[in-house]
A protein has these predicted regions:
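Sliding clamp-binding short linear motifs
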Residues: 1-167
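OB-fold and OB-like beta-barrel modules that bind single-stranded nucleic acids
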Residues: 170-178
Length: 178
């Protein structure tokens, strides 16, 4: 990140099981999703390699044997951002799709049935909601620094670059221990 890389949350169409680099984008691998089964994570990549990118949430659910918990994890981490839909909208859509889904309908169909689109009210998500979702699922925030989550803008009286100038002086600073 300090060398110009852009860290991206996992995406069902771009990420691999392990973290991968595509140009300047560093796509976190599905292996980092603490609550997602590793077999499912590997299957997402294998299925995409065999049959191409996922076109929609519906396409994903038809191709991957996954329950609502797994879909929710992927939605909360932003793995379906290619759809252009808000997370709240995707959550509702996932529940509507999975409530009547039959496993025998999984896989390629001769004729794709159109998914009924529902007109939902626009639900806003807060910057903090996304950051805390990332912390819960990955263990660390990606969309911001941990300092952005603090209630105060105070960052200390001295920065690392100034430590030598303040040798043997008492100073205050904020640090992120990894």
């Amino acid at each position: 990140k300090m060398s110009g890389g852009i860290i991206q949350n996992p995406c069902v169409n771009s990420s691999e099981f392990q973290t991968s680099l595509k140009g300047k984008n560093i796509f976190l691998g599905f292996m980092h999703l603490q609550s997602l089964d590793s077999k499912t994570a590997q299957l997402i990549c294998d299925e995409r390699d065999r049959n191409g990118n996922y076109k929609s949430l519906d396409d994903f659910i038809r191709r991957i044997p996954i329950g609502i918990e797994g879909v929710q994890i992927l939605i909360f981490i932003g793995a379906f951002r290619f759809t252009g839909k808000q997370k709240n909208e995707l959550l509702i859509e996932a529940r509507l799709l999975l409530i009547n889904f039959k496993p025998e309908n999984r896989g390629k169909m001769l004729f794709e049935e159109p998914v009924q689109e529902y007109q939902l009210p626009e639900l806003k998500r807060d910057f903090f909601e996304d950051a805390f979702d990332e912390i819960e699922i990955l263990g660390f925030p990606v969309s911001c620094t941990p300092f952005d989550l603090l209630e105060t803008k105070y960052r200390g009286s001295v920065f690392v670059k100034d430590l030598l100038k303040n040798h043997k002086k008492q100073v205050k600073m904020l640090a992120y221990l990894i």
